[in-house]
Amino acid sequence: MGHKVHPIGIRLGISADWNSKWYANKAEFARYLAADLKVRQVLRKKMSQAGISKILIERPSNTACVSMHVARPGVVIGKRGEDIEMLRKQVSDIMGVPVHINVIEVRKPELDAQLVAESVAQQLERRIMFRRAMKRSVSNAIRLGALGIKISVAGRLNGAEIARSEWYREGRVPLQTLRADIGYGFSEAYTNYGVTGVKVLMYHGDIFSFSSVSQEKQDDGSRGDRNADRSSRRSREVR
């Protein structure tokens, strides 16, 4: 039997980063985690029309910083910043500390896996054929520079009596390569026939960490020094 692993979790610290960055002792850890989950739930519910890609939460000393990557920042900010100010107060009440909210625009939503998954789910809810929705999203991503993309949908497709899964792929999606920059997105479409799940895997290229490269160079240099010492010892013994 195969064992599936989360495509982001397996790459944490290699080619992916954490969505929450803070330190806590054993007593505070559960409270911080519950607050982060509630903040993400509230933001995605309140700003569902903004096209939220991801929400990053940081906790400096006695404050919090929430960064929202969205496709339509105007929906979050509102007229004269009124909406974002109300949002900041709600998030501050949940977290219990002063909160600063950053709104970061996603320039190319067609290259964001989460936004692509939500787009396909919305098309399915509008009763667009799932194959047409998948092929349209895949072609747009490849046209704008993605090296590979795979979209899979599962559920009662087109109202079929028996649920099944279908997928469509173009380009390369190397899931076994940990240095590969793989974007992952998941969304659900609530149709008259039930819930249809949508998964998107998008390949943007390989990530080569400068720290690992420098470490390899140091290792190679130390190996070279050891080899030079051995050769010098051998030459002395021959003499």
UniProtKB/Swiss-Prot annotation:
SMART domains xrefs: KH
Compositional bias annotation for Basic and acidic residues: 216-239
Any one GO cellular component localisation term in the record: cytosolic small ribosomal subunit
GO biological process, one term: translation
Keywords: Ribonucleoprotein, Ribosomal protein, RNA-binding, rRNA-binding
Molecular function GO labels: mRNA binding; rRNA binding; structural constituent of ribosome
KH type-2 domain location: 39-107
Domain of life: Bacteria
HAMAP family linked: Ribosomal_uS3_B (MF_01309_B)
UniProt similarity note: Belongs to the universal ribosomal protein uS3 family.
Assembly and oligomerization: Part of the 30S ribosomal subunit. Forms a tight complex with proteins S10 and S14.
Biological role: Binds the lower part of the 30S subunit head. Binds mRNA in the 70S ribosome, positioning it for translation.
Stated name of the protein: Small ribosomal subunit protein uS3
The organism of origin for this protein: Xylella fastidiosa (strain Temecula1 / ATCC 700964)
Lineage: Bacteria, Pseudomonadati, Pseudomonadota, Gammaproteobacteria, Lysobacterales
